[in-house]
């Protein structure tokens, strides 16, 4: 998605709406043991005037029949924690990051 980097707030909003409109399809196709994790490689404020990344946090939304609701993970030390958590879900272990899958499921 290039809208945030291009500071195109209208395009950014429309792209998010389009993505959101497809979520019911994904949810309908999910099996009982599937977990959907939606995240980003960094946070970004598309209204910021500069061209660099801003200091917003990277989002993480988790959905699945086994997912616990209302979990506050606090501020993590590294974005690698998300990668480690996804790897844990598949029974893998990465060399960086502290997984938190046990807090989500």
Question: What residues fall within each predicted segment?
Answer:
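Feature captures the catalytic ectodomains and active-site-proximal regions of enzymes
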Residues: 1-105
């Amino acid at each position: 998605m290039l809208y945030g980097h291009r500071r195109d707030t209208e395009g950014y909003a429309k792209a998010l709406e389009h993505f959101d409109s497809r979520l019911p399809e994904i949810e309908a196709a999910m099996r009982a043991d599937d977990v959907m994790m939606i995240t980003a490689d960094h946070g970004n404020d598309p209204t910021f005037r500069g061209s660099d990344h801003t200091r917003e946090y990277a989002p993480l939304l988790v959905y699945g029949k086994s997912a616990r609701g209302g979990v506050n993970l606090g501020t993590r030390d590294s974005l690698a924690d998300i990668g480690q958590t996804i790897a844990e879900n598949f029974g893998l272990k990465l060399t960086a990051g502290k997984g938190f899958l046990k807090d989500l499921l």
